[in-house]
């Protein structure tokens, strides 16, 4: 699995398209993705400015790029009374298909807990109002994260995906019971940090699994192909998909077909 393989069309549901790491090589990154068979992707937003920028320009770069609009918990301190209106404008475009990346992150605390809760709650309200999926982030805040979602959705399923799931079977079960889809990144390839995720992998229903790189972050361990830097790229998604297929005993072609169909079902991205 050391080299990128050209495979049946893959859909990367998590790319940080306007990361500074891609600033001088955006088109090259997109070209390599296409060469590797990654023909579709979701470019995820972290604040209002990035949401607007993605909304205005990302689909021009590549025919099958969809976007999100939202405020990451790290940027929750930037949330104000105008934020929801700005996100609402982006979401009027059919290419803007989810609210996020939003949630709670009590690990690095770039925004206070109260700021994060306020921004998260308002974005949930908007998602419920518009009937669009949530693109969810959670780190070191599981219990409160689940509590906030349950309080606002009640007994209804939560329409959305847990971005970059890294946790254990018990937490996986909670998310699945809420109706959520599960996004798996190259974290699963890490021998030490990915142990819980690998243990949980076989318990993710086939119709709830999504695959993503979270590029340029989380370059999969064990990859020894053409890239010599630490940067991750969407063209490495075939490596991640093949790793997941081997871990779960699935046929690679079927896994790719299933995860792509799951993505279309959740985000309504089928052209």
Model-assigned labels for residue ranges:
Residues 1-271:
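Mid-domain alpha/beta scaffold segments of enzyme catalytic cores
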């Amino acid at each position: 699995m050391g080299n990128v393989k050209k495979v049946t069309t893959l859909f990367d549901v998590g790319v940080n398209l306007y990361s500074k790491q891609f600033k001088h090589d955006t088109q090259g990154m997109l070209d390599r993705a296409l060469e590797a068979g990654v023909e579709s992707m979701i470019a995820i937003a972290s604040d209002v400015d990035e949401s607007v920028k993605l909304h205005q320009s990302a689909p021009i770069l590549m025919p099958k790029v969809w976007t999100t609009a939202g405020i990451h918990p790290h940027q929750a301190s930037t949330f104000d009374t105008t934020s929801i209106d700005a996100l609402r404008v982006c979401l009027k475009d059919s290419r803007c298909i989810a609210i996020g990346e939003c949630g709670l992150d009590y690990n690095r605390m770039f925004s206070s807990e109260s700021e994060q809760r306020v921004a998260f709650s308002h974005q949930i309200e908007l998602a419920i109002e518009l009937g669009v999926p949530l693109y969810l982030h959670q780190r070191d805040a599981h219990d409160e994260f689940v509590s906030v979602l349950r309080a606002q959705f009640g007994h209804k399923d939560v329409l959305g995906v847990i971005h970059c799931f890294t946790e254990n079977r018990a937490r996986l079960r909670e998310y699945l019971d809420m109706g959520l889809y599960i996004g798996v990144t190259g974290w699963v390839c890490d021998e030490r940090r990915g142990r819980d995720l690998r243990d949980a992998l076989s318990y993710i229903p086939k119709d709830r699994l999504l695959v993503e790189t979270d590029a340029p972050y989380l370059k999969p361990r064990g990859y020894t192909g053409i890239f010599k830097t630490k940067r991750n790229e969407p063209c490495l998604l075939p490596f991640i998909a093949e790793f997941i297929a081997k871990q779960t005993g699935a046929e690679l072609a079927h896994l790719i077909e299933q995860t792509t169909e799951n993505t279309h079902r959740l985000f309504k991205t089928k052209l």
